[in-house]
Amino acid sequence: MLDLEIVPEISLGCDAWEFVLGMHFSQAIAIIQSQVGIIKGVQVLYSDTTPLGVDIIINLPQDGVRLIFDPVSQRLKTIEVFNMKLVKLRYFGVYFNSPEVLPSIEQIEHSFGATHPGVYDAAKQLFALHFRGLSFYFPVDSKLHSGYAHGLSSLVFLNGASPVVSKMSLYAGSNVLENRVPSLPLSCYHRQMYLESATVLRTAFGHTKGLKLKLFTEGSGRALEPRRQCFTRELLFGDSCEDVATSLGAPNRIFFKSEDKMKIHSSSVNRQAQSKRSDIFFNYFTLGIDVLFDARTQTCKKFILHTNYPGHFNFNMYHRCEFQFLLQADHPSMSDSGHDLVTPTKQEHVNITAYTKWDAISSALATSERPVVLHRASSTNTANPFGSTFCYGYQDLIFEVMPNSHIASVTLYNTAPPRQPAHSWQQHKMQDIRLTVA
């Protein structure tokens, strides 16, 4: 049985770990993985069809705890204890729920003090007692006398027994129905760098140059207290490994690309140009970005931006990359009657973000009609339970699209000649790389 301390508006945890409101989904999963053998029977619930409209939930049925994450920010917004019998709970070190201490009305008021009168939900037959950042729910029979104007303690119970808490909710703010998602707490920074936004830099001729990143991390003020520190960095095609490491710090992982499963779609000349050295990936998981360096020139030739949607093979590996860029539309917008809404001479752009669906993009851009079907598996002869994705090429971009039309990732290629050596340019022509997928 878990023995946990609650801090209203802040956290639920113990000396070894804690679930903190505002923490990222992947951080909560990391805690659960560290407690293997202690926390069991974990369930992850999400919507395949509307991943942005339904909360992501981590359910711990054997411990009576439920973690509710905002589907857009993917940060923890509510902690629920839905079975009080499966967990011990303390407040300022004093138990208010355990096998020896029942969480009755009197016990809750004794532990947490006075608060506003409770609110009765006749439909659910629950009485809710709200504190700031904390709510308790008591099952109350509908035949109960309605003299509760002065709080739960004024209720007259027919059998003389005070009800006990059936559910507890921990959240930020004073209203559980309007609880906000906190920003990432400083205690969850762990000396990592995080992304606020990423702007794709493109030339007037439609070529990608690189990325402009707005970042934040843990800094220190005059009193040496931790605080949020913000700054901006630019990554450009042709940057060396040292340039990127200087701008972003050491990557979370370095991956040597030993094979390219899409190489067969390239020309025979490029397939024969095999290098004994491997291209190198810098994986920045907390930024949602991969940087690929050419094995020959040791310079950046590709960026991969991940959206971290549930139901994708790489879900929970990356934080969502909040990217944004504009593409000039190839097709004019159409009205419901089928007539053009803009004149052919007027330029129109498509704003693409991590939340733009492929249906909206493909209706405005002349993308490749037939996608490349991408199958992923963790090892040879193993199945991918999440299914395949579809890759569409457009200019120097590749969109990886999920079956629900959401973008799983965007790959940005370098279509300009590399800084060195010049003769390697023929290996990166767009007609070959537009079908290449990391």
Swiss-Prot record:
Superkingdom to which the source organism belongs: Eukaryota
PANTHER family: PHAGOSOME ASSEMBLY FACTOR 1, UPF0183 PROTEIN
Keyword Acetylation: no
Biological role stated in the UniProt entry: May play a regulatory role in autophagic activity.
Family: Belongs to the PHAF1 family.
GO biological process, one term: Golgi to plasma membrane protein transport
Location(s), subcellular: Cytoplasm; Preautophagosomal structure
Cellular component aspect of the GO annotation: phagophore assembly site; trans-Golgi network
Protein name: PHAF1 protein CG7083
Chief site of localization: cytoplasm
Keyword field: Cytoplasm
